[in-house]
Amino acid sequence: MDGIWITELAPGEGRRLAVKDLFDTAGIRTTYGSAVFSDHVPAASAEAVARLEAAGWVNAGKANLHEFAYGVTSQNLHYGTVPNPAHPDRTAGGSSGGSAAALALGLVEGALGTDTGGSIRIPAACCDVVGFKPTFGLVPIDGVFPLAPSFDHAGPMARDVLGCLTLMRGLVPDFAAELDSFGSRRVAVTWTSDAVLAAAAALGEIHEVAFPTAEDVVPAFMREVADVHRELYDESGDLYGENISEKIERCLAVTDSEYAEAVAARDRHREGAEAAIDGFDLLLTPTLATAPPPADVVELDVRAELTRFTFPFNALGWPALALPFGQESVQIVGRPGDDRLVLAAGLALEAAL
């Protein structure tokens, strides 16, 4: 299991935490999954790491990831491909694959991940664990290497929803110690599957809606990636892995007009999304549009498919929880600020199982 790349478990009374190697950790090598930063040792920890350590979590080590968090398979040419302990012939997902794998193996009780297009929820779905992307900006990303800043989220991963809730209490001051009783809700469903319909029925009154996808927003994401990497790639591009260099080149090629069109598309996406769930409490979708691909898949061949149901909520900044339900992973989505409601729905869904 070398590809998970987590250090020996640290001693201590606290719960063990795997920290995605995109988060700075004081005095501990932090590579961002790249050879460019192979000797990088930060002086200070990311704010999210510091908050969890202050809450009693013990950093058990750094978890491997797709290089610079730009990929959905955690195939890392420098530090090894992350294996999938739950389904060894399948990808662990990405980019927070090491965090999900460490949980699936039972190495830790909680993990930190980041999510720019699905990078918490996709590996959670692939490895049969739980991942939560909070409302944009709720969990600080200070000290986290950026991918596309207006899409970037940090959040918790755990083996159950209660684990994610416990982590959120450490990550966000004054996050509710207890959630309100869930009760029956009006639940919108889209891109439906049997698991989604069954999950929605367990939560309340079901209504199928047409929800917009966000393919037209992707060039805005790509321009932000280009802005982050432009200077670094010019200086150290020879150290980038081949499977990320190709994507960086594509990002650098996005024109001003393509970017402007994508920004306008993002505004339309937000308007369409808000209209689609008007009058509903929650939205349920599958987490993945397809089964987890084979472990040796070419990442670019599956990237669009694996992010189809996750990326729209990065473009929106809405909270989204991925959790196992039967043989699938379902995604519970709420409006901005409804993080507690989303987690309460997740707890109710787990209880229904």
Predicted regions and their residues:
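Structural helix-boundary/capping segments
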Residues: A50, L105-A188, S193, A315-L353
